[in-house]
Curated annotation (Swiss-Prot):
P1 and P2 exist as dimers at the large ribosomal subunit. Belongs to the eukaryotic ribosomal protein P1/P2 family. This is Large ribosomal subunit protein P2x. Plays an important role in the elongation step of protein synthesis. It comes from Arabidopsis thaliana. Residues 78-115 are annotated as: Disordered. GO terms for cellular component: cytosolic large ribosomal subunit; cytosolic ribosome. The modification Phosphoserine is found at S104, S105. InterPro entries: P1/P2_N_sf, Ribosomal_P1/P2, Ribosomal_P2. HAMAP family: Ribosomal_L12_arch. The lineage of its organism: Eukaryota, Viridiplantae, Streptophyta, Embryophyta, Tracheophyta. It holds the Pfam family Ribosomal_60s. It comes from the Eukaryota. The gene is RPP2C. The keyword Ribonucleoprotein applies. The keyword Transferase does not apply.
Amino acid sequence: MKVIAAFLLAKLGGNENPTSNDLKKILESVGAEIDETKIDLLFSLIKDHDVTELIAAGREKMSALSSGGPAVAMVAGGGGGGAASAAEPVAESKKKVEEVKDESSDDAGMMGLFD
């Protein structure tokens, strides 16, 4: 993620064709760890592609994701517990879903992108 951010910063700064040395300078300026393999991988994946096209394709893929939240598995009540024991797992799963929704609102839809 840091390598992509450095690449985009170089592009935003007016460098139309950033090099790996440009990315290293940006990463060094903020004290970030430099991973040569990730830099090389980025350049191999984006060669012959326009950044705006890549962003548009990513945006399209993100919009295709379900925004309904995480799937909750319903637990069926075991043997002789009756309706009371079956209702307990449902109540617990609803509580867990609410907790997950509260945590995800902090990310503002970024799904932990910068963790």
